[in-house]
Amino acid sequence: MITLKNNNGIPKYTQIIQSIEKAIEQKVLQLNEKLPSINKVVLTHNISRDTVLQAYDELKKRGVIYAILGKGYYVKSTEIKPKKRFFLLFDELNIFKEDLYNSFLKTIGSEAEIDLYFHHFNTNQFKKLIQESKGNYNKYIIMPTNLIEATESIKTLPHKDVFILDQTNPDLLQFPAVYQNFVKDIYDGLAKGKQHLQRYSKLILIFPGFREPIGLKIGFERFCHDFNFNHEIIADFTDINVIQNCVYIIPSDRDLVQVIEQAKRQKLQLGVDYGIISYNETPLKKLVENGITTISTDFETMGKTLAEMILKNSKTQIENPSRIIIRNSI
């Protein structure tokens, strides 16, 4: 009746809950029928007593079973509504992804249990997490970023249960998604700030190319070509000086700190001697150097939209809104 698997990523107490609910659904367990005793489950599966107690207590809270002191646990209800389980695979945790996650949780409410994982831009870790999650969840919400072979791994999951988040690509068009249009977002953002940019001699994009979406580079080059801006793309900002009268477009917050620190060593004033446009809005960027200009998608909206899509069982692809926030830095 109770089936437990090792190394499948699901806690043992959760597997006990799922097994009992499944037994009730399949009428293996009937109303008022006695469950296996705690001691029996402990001995049969070689697990701790606390693990079994945790599972039985949770089933009591859900109104599925009841206890009679000194006798055991019994089926209280055969009307089982198993809680849905969602697999969330993010690239990394930062302040704006945390905003996304919290917004998603707030909108999804108590509809599901959420298991959050991170692949940290590691292809092997991504593939491993996908493989181990198969068959264990009702929905799979995935940030594939620009990982090689990500599409192949995603396609091994049940197609009807997969949702793509943040970055997508032409190979994933069959899946519903809430995504950033990186080409359009950086192009439109720079175009709206064009009046401020025209007083600078060059735009410089710091683009390492490992984690950054290729769409940023494409949109940047397209904007500079269309509006005749002198421009340059560099892979990193290590051991070089800040060039006066240039605007640095900086996707990475690590590079943002490096540029500001180097400019201070050169005694350059931000917004006067050089400019900065950072990617992704955070509360701190309102305050640093009297305000850093940002181009950013709305991560709270992204989380809310995704949750609403799942609740409505919508299968569309939705482009998340983005905007430029002009501040002192340009």
Regions found by a protein language model. Name each.
Residues Q30-A67:
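N-terminal helix-turn-helix
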Residues F87-L88, N136-T145, K202-P208, Q244-S252, ...:
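Periplasmic-binding protein-like
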Residues R254-I330:
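Flexible loop/turn connectors
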Residues M1-L43:
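Extreme N-terminal segment that seeds HTH/winged-HTH DNA-binding domains in transcriptional regulators
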Residues N146-K184, N280-N290:
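Flexible loop/hinge segments that line or gate small-molecule binding clefts
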Residues D188-F227, I318-I330:
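An alpha-beta-alpha
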Residues I38, R62, Y73-Q131, Y137:
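Amphipathic helical "hinge" segments at domain boundaries
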Residues T168-I204, I295-K315:
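Hydrophobic alpha-helical segments within soluble ligand-binding/sensing domains
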